[in-house]
Amino acid sequence: NKIKFLLIRRKNTLNYIEFLRGKYEKNDINKLNYMFNLMTNEEINKIKNNDFDFLWNELWKKTSNLKIYQKEFRKSKNKFNYLKKNKILNDLTEIVSDFEVPEWGFPKGRRNNFEKNIDCALREFSEETNLDINKNNILNNLDSIQENYIGTNGKNYKHIYYLSLCDNDTEVSICEENKNQNYEIGDIGWYSWYEAVSMIRPYNKTKINLLNRVFLFLMNIYYNCIKVPFSKNITNNLLI
């Protein structure tokens, strides 16, 4: 039986979100060019054809007008309008990206205050996949799998993953009633190692290396028949 990984695709690219949040210096043209090259062409066209208020409200939806975000909104809008007034945005929106869809990756999220890593993994997995986590067999006897890397924004990140097994007849889809999933996730599915490697963006080398490590680990189990009876049609997915 083929080993498959559960992957999710973000609704928006990380750099589209960073741009709308004003996470750039308005005169750093090289940085801005870099950000736009990592967006999708659809996102670039949205920026080209809409004002900042529309883009902000579409991205953040019901939370867009919350008081705690108004300072960031005003700062980001001022930067956006500066780029527009000085014709910088015109040049940026002429960029043709190599990417047609946002980033693919594994379910993950940010810990709440005082939340344990495993509890965060279970919560975020449920929110992003809409799967009943109680039906998954988490491999608690394994060490967590860590991914340390520098993001496209230049910041250091550390992701902690947990391995879980799931029956291969488990279906996944975007559920309209799951607001968390609808806000953040654009697509979801089971993919072979070969498919998954080709779907992850090539500059995400640490994520590809992580996928390779897990795949080799599972193949080792398969051939040695130590803990998991793969004859029972088992595939695997990752949690964070």
Language model features: what each stretch is:
Residues 7, 77-101:
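Eukaryote-specific, low-hydrophobicity, charge-rich regions
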Residues 8-26, 30:
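Short, solvent-exposed beta-strand-terminating loops
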Residues 100, 105-142:
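The catalytic Nudix box helix
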Residues 13-15, 127, 198:
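Active-site micro-motifs of SAM-dependent methyltransferase domains
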Residues 17, 33-38, 42, 46-47, ...:
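Nudix hydrolase/Nudix homology domain
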